[in-house]
């Protein structure tokens, strides 16, 4: 997989970095959210627990994903600013049974 950073912005008020990227991949299947999270964490040199994969858009007819990710300075900041559904999707919170 080839990660291309299109835009990187520091957001000190929310204690996070915001990254827009293009991910090119060779396999016949689209990479999972967890695989993307690990790749970005490795690329940025942070713990994968601090990476929130917010948005992924598969480009039709191409082996590419355009995405938006947030990297928090610490876990409490992520828990404070992210909505519950994003925390559940990214494995930072467990879904409550009804």
UniProtKB/Swiss-Prot annotation:
Q: Which GO terms describe its molecular function?
A: structural constituent of ribosome
Q: Which GO terms describe its cellular component?
A: ribonucleoprotein complex; ribosome
The alphabetized UniProt keywords are: Ribonucleoprotein, Ribosomal protein
Pfam families (alphabetical): Ribosomal_S24e
Question: What GO biological process terms does the UniProt entry carry, in alphabetical order?
Answer: translation
What HAMAP family does the entry give?
A: Ribosomal_eS24
Would you identify the family this protein belongs to, as annotated?
Belongs to the eukaryotic ribosomal protein eS24 family.
Protein name as annotated: Small ribosomal subunit protein eS24
- Which species is this UniProt entry from? Thermoplasma acidophilum (strain ATCC 25905 / DSM 1728 / JCM 9062 / NBRC 15155 / AMRC-C165)
Which gene name belongs to this protein?
rps2e
């Amino acid at each position: 997989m080839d990660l291309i950073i299109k835009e990187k912005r520091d957001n000190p008020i929310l204690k996070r970095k915001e990254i827009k990227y293009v991910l090119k991949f060779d396999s016949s299947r689209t990479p999972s959210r967890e695989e993307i999270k690990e790749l970005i964490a490795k690329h940025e040199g942070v713990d994968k627990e601090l990476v929130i994969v917010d948005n992924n858009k598969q480009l039709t007819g191409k082996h590419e994903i355009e995405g938006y990710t947030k990297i928090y300075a610490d876990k409490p900041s992520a828990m404070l600013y992210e909505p519950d559904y994003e925390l559940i999707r990214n494995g930072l919170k467990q879904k409550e049974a009804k």
